Amino acid sequence: MSLIKVPCMQITNMHCSGQTVSLAAGDYHATIVTVGAGLAELTFQGCHLVIPHKPEEMPLAHLGKVLIPWPNRIANGCYRYQGQEYQLPINEHSSKAAIHGLLAWRDWQISELTATSVTLTAFLPPSYGYPFMLASQVVYSLNAHTGLSVEIASQNIGTVAAPYGVGIHPYLTCNLTSVDEYLFQLPANQVYAVDEHANPTTLHHVDELDLNFTQAKKIAATKIDHTFKTANDLWEMTITHPQQALSVSLCSDQLWVQVYSGEKLQRQGLAVEPMSCPPNAFNSGIDLLLLESGKPHRLFFNIYGQRK
């Protein structure tokens, strides 16, 4: 593949995260890696808006990765579809689950480049655990006024309907400060309780689990690793660090969002993962998409920073 260079953008040679693309627009700078179509860095006025990782290293905790054809977990890596049972590889042994899909560690291809945007594409061939065929595309667009906009699209290019879900795994941060200091606001009034393997059990009102962030509230020592159902299918959440005078917002058009307080990353950021369905949807069927042959699905989200 020939490498294309345009002003304000540079593509590196191959490394652990594939290739690196640098984007810039106004006070925003973004680093995208081709492995997992991942968001490796996003800054605003020099401040980190997501926990970054070095492109030359394999990141922890699925930092910034695109999650296709399912987000989060499938319990025991097993599901039934149209009367047939399928077994996926278990890649999170602590929860005995197949986690975060099949494209998070695949190298995507760069198909379009500009100074402020990049389009990445991937082909997902059939496999024993997921015998369906998808073409996926991620478009990262950086704007000096609105920040980073991302569209994730997949199309079923097979001949039979495919079970499908999608998400993405950014860790929002107020310049790598502790989440304990953040004010967190999320317009979601329902949240799942989980079992000992982190699988969702019962949907509760957020007050029942003491996870009501519909009004901005300090996270403090609260540990969060829960799936929330948002009040609307177009929503915006915000974290704010008052002393840093910095806020980071994410908006999306999906009803579900996984929030994790980042214990694996020293609580330097909050994973906020827009998802088309909750965990284990391949078994529960809740908001599981059945992509007919030729049909597409799109997920949109946007991240931007503000100085208070």
From Swiss-Prot:
Record-linked InterPro entries: Aldose_1/G6P_1-epimerase, Gal_mutarotase_sf_dom, GH-type_carb-bd, YihR-like
GO BP terms: 6-sulfoquinovose(1-) catabolic process; galactose catabolic process via UDP-galactose, Leloir pathway; glucose metabolic process; single-species biofilm formation
Gene of this entry: yihR
An annotated Gene Ontology molecular function: carbohydrate binding
Protein name: Uncharacterized protein YihR
Regulation: induction: Induced during growth with sulfoquinovose.
